[in-house]
C-alpha cells in the first residue's frame, strides 16, 4: 500500500474556491480502483492551508489517478488558486497495524 499526502496553501481569499473545486474531485477519486482512502483536510489554525491524505493499493493505482479526467481538470484549475509550492510525500506500508 501507498500513503500519499500533498500539502498546499490557497491564495488569500481563495480558500472557499479551493474547497468548491476539490468538491468535484472527492467522490470520483474515492470510486477509483485501488483507492482505499481519500481525504481532503483544511487546517483549523491556518484556514488557507490544505492537505490531501490518501491511501492507495499501489503506486500504479496512484499513477492512474493522476491521469483520470477529473484529476486532470482539477490540476489545471488549482494553480490559479494557490501560492507557494506543493509538498508531496509518499510512504510505502504493509497496512494499518493495531496500536501497542
Explain the meaning of each model-derived region.
Residues 2-40:
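N-terminal first-folded block
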Residues 2-8, 39-66:
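Short, well-ordered beta-strand segments in beta-rich or mixed alpha/beta enzyme
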Residues 13, 47, 69, 73, ...:
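Short alpha-helical
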Residues 20, 24, 28-36, 55-89:
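An amphipathic, aromatic/His-enriched active-site/gating alpha helix that lines ligand/cofactor pockets
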Residues 40-45, 76-100:
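Glycine-rich beta-strand-turn "strand-cap" elements at beta-sheet edges
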Amino acid at each position: 500500500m501507498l500513503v500519499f499526502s500533498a500539502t498546499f496553501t490557497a491564495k488569500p481569499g481563495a480558500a472557499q474556491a479551493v474547497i468548491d473545486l476539490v468538491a468535484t474531485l472527492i467522490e470520483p477519486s474515492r470510486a477509483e480502483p485501488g483507492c482505499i482512502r481519500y481525504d481532503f483536510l483544511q487546517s483549523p489554525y491556518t484556514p488557507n492551508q490544505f492537505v490531501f491524505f490518501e491511501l492507495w493499493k499501489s503506486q500504479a493505482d496512484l499513477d492512474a489517478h493522476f491521469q483520470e479526467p477529473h484529476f486532470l481538470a482539477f490540476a489545471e484549475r488549482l494553480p490559479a488558486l494557490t501560492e507557494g509550492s506543493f509538498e508531496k510525500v509518499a510512504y510505502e506500508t504493509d497496512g494499518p497495524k493495531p496500536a501497542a
